[in-house]
Amino acid sequence: MSSTTRRRSAWVAAATVGVSSFLAVAGITPAIAAAGAGQPATVTVPAASPVRAAVDGEYAQRFLAQYDKIKDPANGYFSAQGIPYHAVETLMVEAPDYGHETTSEAYSYWLWLEALYGQVTQDWAPLNHAWDTMEKYMIPQSVDQPTNSFYNPNSPATYAPEFNHPSSYPSQLNSGISGGTDPIGAELKATYGNADVYQMHWLADVDNIYGFGATPGAGCTLGPTATGTSFINTFQRGPQESVWETVPQPSCEEFKYGGKNGYLDLFTKDASYAKQWKYTSASDADARAVEAVYWANQWATEQGKAADVAATVAKAAKMGDYLRYTLFDKYFKKIGCTSPTCAAGQGREAAHYLLSWYMAWGGATDTSSGWAWRIGSSHAHFGYQNPLAAWALSTDPKLTPKSPTAKADWAASMQRQLEFYTWLQASNGGIAGGATNSWDGAYAQPPAGTPTFYGMGYTEAPVYVDPPSNRWFGMQAWGVQRVAELYYASGNAQAKKILDKWVPWVVANISTDGASWKVPSELKWTGKPDTWNAAAPTGNPGLTVEVTSYGQDVGVAADTARALLFYAAKSGDTASRDKAKALLDAIWANNQDPLGVSAVETRGDYKRFDDTYVANGDGIYIPSGWTGTMPNGDVIKPGVSFLDIRSFYKKDPNWSKVQTFLDGGAEPQFRYHRFWAQTAVAGALADYARLFDDGTTTPDTTAPTVPTGLQAGVVTSTEATISWTASTDDTRVTGYDVYRGATKVGTATTTSFTDTGLTASTAYAYTVRAFDAAGNVSAPSAALTVTTKATPSDTTAPSVPAITSSSSTANSVTIGWSASTDNAGGSGLAGYDVYRGATRVAQTTALTFTDTGLTASTAYEYTVRARDVAGNVSAPSTAVSVTTKSDTTPDTTAPSVPAGLAAMTVTETSVALTWNASTDTGGSGLKGYDVYRGATRVGSTTTASYTDTGLTAATAYQYTVRATDNAGNVSAASAALSVTTKTPQTGGSCSVAYNASSWNSGFTASVRITNTGTTTINGWSLGFDLTAGQKVQQGWSATWTQSGSTVTATNAPWNGTLAPGQTVDVGFNGSHTGQNPNPASFTLNGASCT
């Protein structure tokens, strides 16, 4: 299951205007008093220009192919009004409880899609149309929020506590608890000349399936006969309320549906209730909209077309002005509040400056006796932060909002957000949950020992716990992509530090093995961050994250790739670039279908469709005695299930799958096409095209060198540690697969591995294979035989080691310790385990260890434990705290000169070089190497290898290498190496790999063509026969024609040159009549291929 959007209502708030009957549960429908439903104007899905300029580059072509699938009206991504659905499919329950709802998230991804389309094609009309559609249907119009003029910034809302379980609701409004003042309300009104709020509401029922008819601009609750989109809300009742426990309600309440007070008294307790409107914005979606428009303006300006997007840019700046409400505490209380009676905030005392979960606003429908309210949010999740948007809103003159204090607010927010990421970053890279200024949603005192961030308490799962909000890896992709964008756009050093730690963790946890590709799915967190100290961050040695499951969520994979690509483009890191490319290639080759891309999803959680309430547990809670009806007549009463108040699901074309499951059958499976995920894939393809693809990308087909020097380390009766000498690669080695006999027992990203669960007194043979980001795998190493120790009778642990020395640089710590002894007659000392905080960072037989890759000016705590052959482990040594040196210590020492320069592989057009790694003793750390061909620098690399391409056959070249460190010091040049490229050979050959994925009457074929000869192919034509009546319908990356059974694919302008060993991927969608055999043979330029 993709966890996608998880939105919360703004809980409970009401304007304090002397009337006690105002329910203000944020995020419900508009309060329009217009009569008559009216017919929504039919808005066709905005296609791109009917004629667009030719686009070069394989990945730009892929982007356009995916874009065209999304924008094809026949594929069902948009409604008749031109509104993007959450998904093509209707039977879908996640944050939206129906696939044909929409979210502010979907609109923000649409804006991203059109921004990228404008960059690729220079056509900006679709972007402007997307914003106009959002403004019309997702931002409440003036008539939808009619009583904002009554809003009083000095008394924003009436307090009502949140609770941890839905059964504690409704929540009593309490005017005796004072809130603070709203410092931006009057300013916004003065700036824009009215009191309207310019934010998207987060959720809408596009097809009016519920029948509330809360139609933007047309009416309040016009009922089931109203056509077009309808503002609705769901989440209202605390962190335990999952989507399965929600009661849908209109965002405008006229008491037509629900109970006697509509739906209000399910959520808030009051003496009486008034008709009203209420909306909730989701901060990440509005910020993403600003983010997309920032890039659109950059690209349009580069094209000389800034005027084409100027109006949309101005609207995005306005949205950013109002988005500031999410930077404030819910009831504008001071930051660090731990009691409902804590002091109310004045001015910026209530600003936490983080993008919190929402802001919300509402008011009366009666304009003759109006009232209105506004709230921020106390809860901040790292996955909602957007430092790129904050930076743009505070530094880009075109995007800086008009309000006088907006620029300063967003500048403070950018810095605070980056600190937030740093505070929450686990010692091994992942970003933990978030923080709250209102513990338990009621300003309670946090438990003793709760770490804090500027007074806000750490929460591992902010906002919701069913499932925990930071279990889903997608939050990592979403949150960190924006950090990577900021780093790419501005070079921000703090953003880079976050990424330098996050990227290797992510890269190591992605597999790109063809159809079995996978990315992390669920995470497990251990420990907590330390209380934040901006002057001396600790690096959180006591906080770690573990990937507990993997999956094929195409949207998460694509947004992860986008984060890696922005980082790679700025840093020059090839491992992240190549991993992202390989991931996108795997999805493109294995997951395409006629609607876009997809993977099979098994939905065991659909068992909750018919769950009923269990006291203090799961299920929809309806208070005793409460009854009401949905617009279609479904009864709402205690004991109802999710399905009972959504009976329309029983008519869904896919319902039989679910019913079979509920009756005891197999878990249902689906191929979903979520709008955000499809757009994320398109975005990643466009990013690669823009940042890396010049139309002549040469795939990496060279495997790393074979690992050598295998040797045994610590060996006990049940464990064996082995190590080896690092391999080299033409790009970068990304890991090693370790085999025990013929069985792969693990993967390592370093040059050592510990195999556990072994049998005593048994010989095991180990081999190791190296692999790179492109998936190339080396031959196995020479085998190493290790014999485990005999089962000992020793149950006594060795003596405790004592740390005797420590030293540090800016990026490393070295510790030494005294030798331990084992008991007389014992099994013997095996080695030592070294811990940084709670994380074991090394096993060694030596008495010293150097920990590298650390952060400057940061304190780290180390302990050492001794281990004997029997597996007994000593108590830890006394901890020693070591602080790394400051980056400000000037490093003026150059790295050592690279030695051992050699040519590994030489072809007619390329030379693969390797050399021995340099060392750096100046403290700043080795940065990389500059490679020179003659006097010209031809490339830089972070590893001790480099491949120079585009050379001329039979030509002599001379190479030297210089090492660089992070302080900018450069070594002297290595000894020169002369290399002559190979002489061209006559003749040529080819191979073709053909894979087809079939369904019903259609199929997608992926074709990989490889030049296996020794000469370059300039221009190619592939031929083959489809012998069972199959037809080619749509192809990509080539010009496709078919005559009878014969199919011909001719190269595109950008992939016609195939160097020896080079591969090109093409493909097509086709139809069949029941049989779909693969072609029996292939020709390339008339010659047969294998």
From Swiss-Prot:
Disulfide bonds join C990-C1089. Belongs to the glycosyl hydrolase 48 (cellulase L) family. Pfam families: CBM_2, fn3, Glyco_hydro_48. Residues 983-1090 form the CBM2 domain. Residues 1069-1090 are annotated as: Disordered. GO terms for molecular function: cellulase activity; cellulose 1,4-beta-cellobiosidase activity; polysaccharide binding. PROSITE patterns: CBM2, CBM2_A, FN3. The active site is at D513. Gene3D superfamilies: 1.50.10.10, 2.60.40.290, Endo-1,4-beta-glucanase f. Domain 2 (2.170.160.10), Endo-1,4-beta-glucanase f. Domain 3 (4.10.870.10), Immunoglobulins (2.60.40.10). It comes from the Bacteria. Residues 54-699 are annotated as: Catalytic. The keyword Disulfide bond applies. It comes from Cellulomonas fimi (strain ATCC 484 / DSM 20113 / JCM 1341 / CCUG 24087 / LMG 16345 / NBRC 15513 / NCIMB 8980 / NCTC 7547 / NRS-133). Hydrolyzes cellohexaose to a mixture of cellotetraose, cellotriose and cellobiose, with only a trace of glucose. It hydrolyzed cellopentaose to cellotriose and cellobiose, and cellotetraose to cellobiose, but it did not hydrolyze cellotriose. Also has weak endoglucanase activity. Hydrolyzes glucosidic bonds with inversion of anomeric configuration. This is Exoglucanase B.
